Amino acid sequence: MVLNSLDKMIQLQKNTANIRNICVLAHVDHGKTTLADCLISSNGIISSRLAGKLRYMDSREDEQIRGITMKSSAISLHYATGNEEYLINLIDSPGHVDFSSEVSTAVRICDGCIIVVDAVEGVCPQTQAVLRQAWLENIRPVLVINKIDRLIVELKFTPQEAYSHLKNILEQINALTGTLFTSKVLEERAERETESQVNPNSEQGEQVYDWSTGLEDTDDSHLYFSPEQGNVVFTSAIDGWGFGIEHFARIYSQKIGIKKEVLMKTLWGDYYINMKAKKIMKGDQAKGKKPLFVQLILENIWSLYDAVLKKDKDKIDKIVTSLGLKIGAREARHSDPKVQINAICSQWLPISHAVLAMVCQKLPSPLDITAERVERLMCTGSQTFDSFPPETQALKAAFMKCGSEDTAPVIIFVSKMFAVDAKALPQNKPRPLTQEEIAQRRERARQRHAEKLAAAQGQAPLEPTQDGSAIETCPKGEEPRGDEQQVESMTPKPVLQEENNQESFIAFARVFSGVARRGKKIFVLGPKYSPLEFLRRVPLGFSAPPDGLPQVPHMAYCALENLYLLMGRELEYLEEVPPGNVLGIGGLQDFVLKSATLCSLPSCPPFIPLNFEATPIVRVAVEPKHPSEMPQLVKGMKLLNQADPCVQILIQETGEHVLVTAGEVHLQRCLDDLKERFAKIHISVSEPIIPFRETITKPPKVDMVNEEIGKQQKVAVIHQMKEDQSKIPEGIQVDSDGLITITTPNKLATLSVRAMPLPEEVTQILEENSDLIRSMEQLTSSLNEGENTHMIHQKTQEKIWEFKGKLEQHLTGRRWRNIVDQIWSFGPRKCGPNILVNKSEDFQNSVWTGPADKASKEASRYRDLGNSIVSGFQLATLSGPMCEEPLMGVCFVLEKWDLSKFEEQGASDLAKEGQEENETCSGGNENQELQDGCSEAFEKRTSQKGESPLTDCYGPFSGQLIATMKEACRYALQVKPQRLMAAMYTCDIMATGDVLGRVYAVLSKREGRVLQEEMKEGTDMFIIKAVLPVAESFGFADEIRKRTSGLASPQLVFSHWEIIPSDPFWVPTTEEEYLHFGEKADSENQARKYMNAVRKRKGLYVEEKIVEHAEKQRTLSKNK
């Protein structure tokens, strides 16, 4: 319990085998920060009485106000057991879903994690999410079941009921672990199948054998949580106690005389003790006996709580005496039972010992990093470890060794950048004065006092001052000198204050190999850096990076300026950090944006990107209240973008500065940081910018009152379609199937385009494979430019063919025949969920194979102008006709592309120009040089036949094609049934039974839809799973807490896009619809409301009347 010195921590850092890098993960309000407080108090950093109340790791003011953790923060703890001393680098992480990106940054630099579960609420949605993140990062978890006291105090469980409840929680979390394990085994099996297909020498029948043994032959016993394995601890962090069954096994082995190993296996499970025979028997439930866990452990804890809550002083004294504890008189006389329980239990079952002992025994050290995790960190999804150059593959051994030799390469990963006040840095903190400085200050103060007395009496001192000048006797002469001295002493202070107000950025990092020393030169590798690119540009055999190295993309070179030991709110200065430790690095703000890999060798690949569970979806536009402060806002947004791993900063085409965040709480934190820390100005924030998507659907079969569309309605629908088509300008042909035929303004090219809705499964496949589509586009563009920078890997090729196979599987039927092979492009931004299909007979081009024929001049001409067609498609999918939002789930089919008139016009124009050139060159007796120049110009024009786009009064022909293709796509959309797509949240709500009706009322009011409702066994808690439009989510959490008096708390995570069923352009046609919806039907049409709101925000035309029948709004006659 003694506060450790910095020297002690530096000494512990050098023993890599005894380092444990761990993070605490849990659902919100399950007790992570309280548990961290208890562990911190064991080192004497805070008082044990303040544990759970101080929330030491929550250093932000808004964290203390809201009572939730918003950022990951680290602290180093010392733990001694027996002859071993351990250094625990503990990282506390948030549990709120808005800050799940902070969990990702913490998990990446850890080797193990503590999963905290509330004993009452059990496994919650965010528990599943953090366990999945730990699994993806290949780190080992241990389990802490917290808040056991709630089972006693709140739910009034008996020990037997509590045991059954705890068993259910363990079963739930082990079932989740089993699901993750099964998916991993099946993925590995699928990879082996793919390799066996590539390798023809594989034995037949192996696939069937793998199917039956993939799960059976894999040992998964070490993955599951079980108290007998020692990876589960039962705690009450607020009361300061916790235990593993090893503690009681050691005690009862001495009392009962049964071996400790036997008790370790039987204290948890269906075992009971036969006291007469002193034997442990199996089958407690069948024989109606109490399990050992209930009889020997839970009943003792229950009896203690019962005695304290009932204030049975005699029983309390008896328990304290039997346990050999010493309780202070203050705690014994205290009226609050919690104080007495804490005083007794923290001595009897100290939580810090139970948790830290489990961490040291069950979680790995940095030396135990697995080869699988190393390869996963180094390889992105499109690369395999074998595809790296030999220099890169050799680094795997350095990862595994985690050596501190001078020859070992230094490898550091920066998971995030965080901002601290410059005054909080160790070098800027005030230090204690030395004796000499104190004496000098005393002498100067005495001298100033003597001068003031002399000035007041009008007498000069006999001795001169230190600088040799005599002090004037006149008080008036003294005043200017005194003022001058005052100005000199006060001048530096504003400058210092201004410097101290600046934010300094610290890199949150971990050393994986080598020793990080202050001043060491190192490469900074961005997420997109490629070691192959470096080795291609830099000659072999270079030793140190000289200044003459060529520019390599996404790589910089800098020195490690300052190294810090992270101690929660404090930072300690370090000269060097051995491998395996977590540290802070100063001076990287100009080189690292959010995350980066630091390495002394440029052959190191960047670590794979972090896995973010939450997608940024909430957008607001910000601007300064005073326009002159725009530079401060821009600078502040840059700093905010660097300080937050999840936030996105965008500048739209309109010039708006847009902030994209993960949710309302995250948005509020970002705005507070912008106003108070980074920009320090007053800002105006717009209403949330709701994202929508536009799409088309099949014609409906039922009307708005759920009746089958009859003849009268079909006539009305046809009439409505004709009205829609009448809005299309003249000269554009529309057939009955929605085929749009349009010509360019100069009438030289004709395009025929049709729009079709994609099946929902295909849209989902396109969304899931957007990164793969982007890689395909980069590969295609590099090949077209004659470069070979993007070498395709075998794994990527397999993914591409798998992606194509999925599309072929879902695009079946007469309409979609052979359409996958004819896909020309994806959009928007060439990787979106829309497809351009080329069915033109004159020119065949596919995204899978490229242009079919590059040799013929005609195909070359089509290929050159094809980029204009694709650009028009990209523009059309980027902004739809309804409210200029991106399209989703639409297939545009280019049925015809006629360039015959363009070729004729080009040939005739070229002939005329050639004739004029001939006449000019042969028309007179010019000298030979002029004739040579004319012939060269003619040859140049001739060589560009069919390749140079014609330019006329309508502009370049390529630009006309872009605009025409864009208009064709928009008109093809408008002749189909259009729909809006809304972004949807998955909403998980935990509520008690008595407020369930209010929860449903709030959900229905906000257009929510309940998907599932289940009751937590043994409690009165319900878990409601619903979907809620993002547009209706603002203020939802506050409203539901108000309506339920804080008994329900929602967790909102972006899930998917969903089509709004109502047609935004629908008008009533039948009598039933007129009666139900009224003449205008604008009050019930949710899609129209959303569409008009977006159009108003963007300044587009909105078809609505502001005032109608104004005389009805006036009182024309006075009532007497």
Curated annotation (Swiss-Prot):
The modification N6-acetyllysine is found at K528. GTPase activity is stimulated in the presence of 60S ribosome subunits. It catalyses: GTP + H2O = GDP + phosphate + H(+). Keywords: Acetylation, Disease variant, Elongation factor, GTP-binding, Hydrolase, Nucleotide-binding, Protein biosynthesis, Ribosome biogenesis. GO terms for cellular component: cytosol; ribonucleoprotein complex. Residues 438-452, 475-484 have a biased composition (Basic and acidic residues). GO terms for molecular function: GTP binding; GTPase activity; ribosome binding; translation elongation factor activity. Its EC number is 3.6.5.-. Residues 920-930 have a biased composition (Polar residues). Changing M882K: In SDS2; uncertain significance. InterPro entries: EFG_II (IPR041095), EFG_III/V (IPR035647), EFG_V-like (IPR000640), EFL1 (IPR056752), P-loop_NTPase (IPR027417), Ribosomal_Su5_D2-typ_SF (IPR020568), Ribsml_uS5_D2-typ_fold_subgr (IPR014721), Small_GTP-bd (IPR005225). Belongs to the TRAFAC class translation factor GTPase superfamily. Classic translation factor GTPase family. It is linked to Shwachman-Diamond syndrome 2: A form of Shwachman-Diamond syndrome, a disorder characterized by hematopoietic abnormalities, exocrine pancreatic dysfunction, and skeletal dysplasia. Intermittent or chronic neutropenia is the most common hematological manifestation, followed by anemia and thrombocytopenia. Some patients progress to bone marrow failure, myelodysplastic syndrome and malignant transformation, with acute myelogenous leukemia being the most common. Exocrine pancreatic dysfunction is generally the first presenting symptom in infancy. Associates with the 60S ribosomal subunit. Found in a complex consisting of the 60S ribosomal subunit, SBDS and EFL1. Interacts with SBDS and binds to GTP and GDP; the interaction with SBDS decreases EFL1 affinity for GDP and facilitates GDP release. This is Elongation factor-like GTPase 1. It comes from Homo sapiens. The gene is EFL1.
